[in-house]
Amino acid sequence: MSMRANRVGEQMKKELGDIISRKLKDPRIGFLTVTDVRVSGDLQIAKVYISVLGDEKKREEALKGLAKAKGFIRSEIGSRIRLRKTPEIEFEFDESIDYGNRIETLIHELHSEKPSE
């Protein structure tokens, strides 16, 4: 990713957090966090990584709500960030948080099984 793509991604991350928390009224979108935004080098596609508090069903519902609001979100981004063309937005779950939690759980299990001397 180029330096410009990184800057656009960081700005989009900030704006998306604001748009999702303040502008979207869809009840399917619960407690949601934008963890990362990766913009392609040509600034045409933005992959938005999200984390949702809750089970798999809540995650799927949040993704459906975001897909429904994608056009509105893209137009809001276009009005807030000066770009020739607003990137196409793709939402994906950020699996790294679940992976990190799983690793932490395994480490705690190993420590609890370790015999004390």
UniProtKB/Swiss-Prot annotation:
GO biological process: maturation of SSU-rRNA; ribosome biogenesis
Cell compartment(s), UniProt: Cytoplasm
CC per GO annotation: cytosol
Any matching Pfam family: RBFA
Keywords: Cytoplasm, Ribosome biogenesis
GO molecular function: ribosomal small subunit binding
Gene3D superfamilies with a match to the protein in the record: 3.30.300.20
Entry similarity comment: Belongs to the RbfA family.
Alphabetical list of PANTHER family matching this protein: RIBOSOME-BINDING FACTOR A, CHLOROPLASTIC-RELATED
Subunit structure and binding partners: Monomer. Binds 30S ribosomal subunits, but not 50S ribosomal subunits or 70S ribosomes.
Protein role: One of several proteins that assist in the late maturation steps of the functional core of the 30S ribosomal subunit. Associates with free 30S ribosomal subunits (but not with 30S subunits that are part of 70S ribosomes or polysomes). Required for efficient processing of 16S rRNA. May interact with the 5'-terminal helix region of 16S rRNA.
Protein name: Ribosome-binding factor A
Species the sequence originates in: Bacillus subtilis (strain 168)
Name of encoding gene: rbfA
